[in-house]
Regions:
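Peptidoglycan glycan-strand catalytic modules in the bacterial/periplasmic cell-wall system
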Residues: 13-205
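Conserved small/polar residues in nucleotide/adenosyl-binding loops
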Residues: 241-246
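Extracytoplasmic/periplasmic solute-binding protein
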Residues: 231-239
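Terminal amphipathic helices with adjacent charged low-complexity linkers/tails
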Residues: 193, 206-230
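Aromatic-capped interface at the extracytoplasmic side
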Residues: 1-5
């Protein structure tokens, strides 16, 4: 089953008002439907992670060949990924022990299984189903899983309200949530955010004027302001008081 599991628990008072959110480790996730996720956010991840997502059948042979050629040309460094969004969904929901792999054989075995299941999954479900579950499953740093909670954590808003600039920030995190954390490493995130926007422009997802507006946006100042507000309200990784109740 490639559907994400583990969600936060909302505590309500006797009048139905949210007063707290209980978060177990690995469960800080809210489920959102594909209709609630901005198309720019979907395209940001496609542009950066899997440009042929809407064309391939689960694995991207072109990407695999490109990664192989790059690895050979670099003297055996095969660090360039060729995993599709479908494969990444499976890695995050089925092969959850991948971080403990200790050998090349372990990684290769998992990759082969991943590729096989990716093709089988794409025979059974739509691209929208895959995208929805992928965006609900990904680790986006700061103990957030999925774009809904990450949107609240970094921008203090519902995911449906994200601007293009903010969408690019979230997509920039996913390769390495620690290194590209927009709070602790805004410069690194900004570099990768530019790659997201450049890819979106090159792949025809956005216009030049949309690109220019996003590039000019001072998004990192807003992120720091939201972070300060959340810290003032006593947020932490495992138990956070609902923001609405702390105003």
């Amino acid at each position: 089953d490639a559907t994400p599991t583990g969600y936060l628990t909302t505590v309500l008072d006797n009048q139905g008002n949210e007063i707290a959110t209980l978060v177990a480790s690995g469960s800080n996730r809210k489920n959102v439907t594909i209709d609630e996720i901005p198309i720019n956010l979907q395209h940001a991840f496609v542009a950066l992670e899997d440009s042929r997502f809407y064309e391939h059948n689960g694995i991207d042979l072109t990407g695999i060949i490109r990664a192989g050629v790059t690895g050979i040309a670099s003297g055996g460094n095969f660090s360039q990924g060729a995993s599709t969004i479908t494969q990444q969904l499976l890695k995050n929901t089925v092969f959850t022990e991948w971080t403990s792999e200790t050998s090349f054989i372990d990684k290769l075995e998992r990759k082969i299984q991943e590729q096989y299941l990716a093709v089988q999954l794409e025979k059974k479900v739509s691209k929208n189903w895959i995208m929805e579950n992928y965006l609900n499953a990904i680790n986006l740093g700061q103990n957030t899983l999925g774009v809904a909670v990450a949107s609240e954590r970094y921008f203090g808003k519902d995911v449906s309200e994200l601007t293009l600039s903010e969408c690019a920030v979230l997509a920039a995190i996913t390769q390495n949530p620690s290194r590209f954390n927009p709070i602790s490493n805004p410069e690194k995130n900004a570099e990768r955010r530019m790659k997201v926007l450049n890819n979106m422009l090159d792949q025809g997802f956005i216009s030049q004027s949309e690109y220019d507006e996003a590039v000019a946006d001072n998004v990192y100042d807003r992120i720091q302001l939201v972070n300060v507000e959340l810290q003032d309200n006593g947020i932490n990784s495992y138990f956070k008081i609902g923001r609405a109740s702390c105003r």
